[in-house]
Amino acid sequence: MRTLVKGGDIVAFNEKSHEIIRDGVVVFENGMITFVGFSYRDPVDKIIDATRKLVCPGFINTHVHPHANAGDYFRNDPGKKDYFGSNYLTYLTPKKGAKRPPDLEDFRESGKFGLVQAIKNGSTTIVIYGGGAEGEDDFVTMVGELGVRAYLAPSFRNVDFYYEGTGALRYVWDDAAGEKGLQQAVTFIQKHRGSYNGLIQGMLFPRQPDTCSPELLKKTRNAARELGVGIQIHAAMNLIEFHEILMKYGKTPIEFLHDLGFLGPEVILGHCVFLTGHSWTALPRGDDLKLIADSGASVSHCPLEYAKLGIALESFDRYLAKGVNVSLGTDTYPLDMVNEMRIASLANRLIEGDYLSGSYRDVFNAATLGGARAIGRDDLGRLCPGAKADMLIINLCKSEIGAVFDPIKALIEYGSGRDIETVIIDGKTVVDRGEFKGLNEAELLSRVQAEAEKIWEKVSGWDFLGRRAHEISPWAFPLKKAR
């Protein structure tokens, strides 16, 4: 079926960069864009009126943990002060002898909820970090039926963590677990890659440099080459990892990966915040950014997650100036790429002390072209003939946004994912008039709330001090209930 989108401001790609075509048209057929321009005279089967709206490429969200909503409340202000804002350690690490937090009791609810929100907020391609470890066939079915373009496979590592009763963090090494996890991921990719009309693709996900042995990382690199897939690893993501690698190998995490021969164009470095020269690392010597740029590896920047902790890249502009390809990810909730673009820009301006830095052009490119480059796809993140028909129609004619001079600036400065009315993936409309097609969102939210409340009730079972949820993360104001 041939579909024509007409009348909006089209963010078109001219083979070099994005440009705006006012009152333009986009034509797509069989999941591919066939025409972008000012007028189209051939017959079409369907017309979508985008008059006075913004039509842009779907966002490529390169780092997502979709099931993490219930745990987000324990990752930010209640973090352990002696762990330098290493947020995931405060919630995901249990006390000795305890089971891991059951935040995946029913991934079909929490995971589905997270992915739905990401899609509604404009993510048409999602890198699901570690997806598929639990009930892999059901997970792939759930992702595939949502109609999103996804890169996924179970993550793996050699290490498990636990806390002593004193709060001391302990690493427990298990080389066999890492080897087994890698093989499970390889088998997963071989089984599921290319399913759902090619929407499901694979990627290897070793967890962190401090939780994977050099041998496991080398085997991961070799497996990726044999499979022809990319790799993403959380790297330079927190100071625990940074100092652990520095003490163990005398290198930064980036130097460690570089010297292993791990870095390359197929590799995405998740977060990649704590580098030489960063104010938190107190290590001015060395040039991690040059190593990344020279290797061709990409960075998945998740600005909101770090802004919550008072941390930022130093800086987005410096990474670009060094030649590093930067993409954007949401990491955890609220999974809104428009918000991530805004935070990326504002955080950069604060770090640089320069209101002209962190341009909206650059952060929009990171959410589209940067993401496409990171996953090795020159048919995504752009609207041009030959590209996949992944696009968004965004309503900027709202009092919350006001008069629109530049639609991209208006979107990033004043808009949000809630302004996205239509999401088209592979030529199919997945979100229409702001509603996810074929899904009762209210019922899903109700089930997710019930699941989250069960998780919160069990927090004391794995917290190293046995604290309840409200003790770990106190309410903003005291709660009073009727007796």
For each feature predicted by the language model, list its residue ranges.
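Active-site gating loops and adjacent loop-to-helix segments of metal-dependent hydrolytic enzymes
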Residues: 72-107, 159-176, 239-267, 279, ...
